[in-house]
Amino acid sequence: MNNQDIYINLLNILSKEDIKVDEPMKKHISFRVGGPADILVRPRTEEQLKNVLKLVKEESIPYLIIGNGSNILIKDGGIRGVVIELADNFNSYEINDTRMTAQSGALLSVLGKALQKQELKGFEFASGIPGTLGGALAMNAGAYGGEMKDIVKSVRLMDMEGNIFELSNEQMEFGYRKSIISKNGYIALSAELELQEGNYDEIKSLMDDLATRRITKQPLNFASAGSTFKRPTGYFAGKLIEETGLRGLTLRGAQVSEKHCGFVVNQGEASAKDILDLIYVIKSAVYAKFGVMLEEEVKILGED
């Protein structure tokens, strides 16, 4: 099935404005790089999502599911097939007592503010993470001593057959930057979070403190995908990179952040290749000096 046929079939599922052809992926990921997606779709209901999945499966069309693109790098050749975006088109939430139920496309920052307003604590660590709930669940996102596994009660998921089911916290198999979602290719639809009653001023104070620490220590004024590398056992990636003498190293439009060596940033005009080449230089130099092979935390996708 060619792209024109795929588009025609998608029009039976989605409205025209929710289907984009040859869509530049740099508009959809935080690194602000990446070639075009053949087709990008934005389903607004679980039924639409189910029908899109049915189409790509039956026709063997390659597909990729993204949130707000804060932890991925799309190569300059772009993405073949269909990109399914679950972001502000899939972001409702509600709060009952000490529990929040939210769709996977909801931004963590938005959820954090809503919980603060309701004087519910436990989510502060995640409130400044630049991503969606779905992405945070998939990788068990964490910061400042907290992880998603600490607050998740249950998650509603969809498999590639369109089956919808619910898993408990234990069944989610949360680990360091992983979960059953990343393991089995499930799609997070929504999650129920368990919080605790707190004090508005104390919650706000902690959130403000964490925000200040991020602003002070992280290069938020440049496009990036957050921490570029996972933490190697017994080490800190940023410290290894700094001690290798790479702080500020620039390769065309990509740079090892001056503020935090664990971040590779786009100075404005970088290509995906610039970033990937710099990542290779970093990994090679750190391995040569310390014998430690860094592993990317950012997901690298697409074609050269």
UniProtKB/Swiss-Prot annotation:
Q: Which UniProt keywords apply?
A: Cell cycle, Cell division, Cell shape, Cell wall biogenesis/degradation, Cytoplasm, FAD, Flavoprotein, NADP, Oxidoreductase, Peptidoglycan synthesis
Pfam families listed in its UniProt record: FAD_binding_4 (PF01565), MurB_C (PF02873)
Query: Where found?
Result: Cytoplasm
Is the Cell wall biogenesis/degradation keyword given for this protein?
Answer: yes
Query: What processes does the entry annotate via GO biological process terms?
Result: cell division; cell wall organization; peptidoglycan biosynthetic process; regulation of cell shape
SUPFAM superfamilies, sorted: FAD-binding/transporter-associated domain-like (SSF56176), Uridine diphospho-N-Acetylenolpyruvylglucosamine reductase, MurB, C-terminal domain (SSF56194)
Quote the PROSITE patterns the UniProt record gives. Answer: FAD_PCMH (PS51387)
Superkingdom classification of source: Bacteria
**InterPro entries from the entry?**
FAD-bd_PCMH (IPR016166), FAD-bd_PCMH-like_sf (IPR036318), FAD-bd_PCMH_sub1 (IPR016167), FAD-bd_PCMH_sub2 (IPR016169), MurB (IPR003170), MurB_C (IPR011601), MurB_C_sf (IPR036635), Oxid_FAD_bind_N (IPR006094)
All residue ranges annotated as the FAD-binding PCMH-type domain in the record: 32-198
Q: Which reaction does it catalyse?
A: UDP-N-acetyl-alpha-D-muramate + NADP(+) = UDP-N-acetyl-3-O-(1-carboxyvinyl)-alpha-D-glucosamine + NADPH + H(+)
**Gene Ontology MF annotations:** FAD binding; UDP-N-acetylmuramate dehydrogenase activity
What pathway is it annotated to? Answer: Cell wall biogenesis; peptidoglycan biosynthesis
Q: Which PANTHER family match?
A: UDP-N-ACETYLENOLPYRUVOYLGLUCOSAMINE REDUCTASE
* Role played: Cell wall formation.
Family to which the UniProt record says this protein belongs: Belongs to the MurB family.
Instruction: Tell me the protein's name.
Output: UDP-N-acetylenolpyruvoylglucosamine reductase
Organism name: Clostridioides difficile (strain 630) (Peptoclostridium difficile)
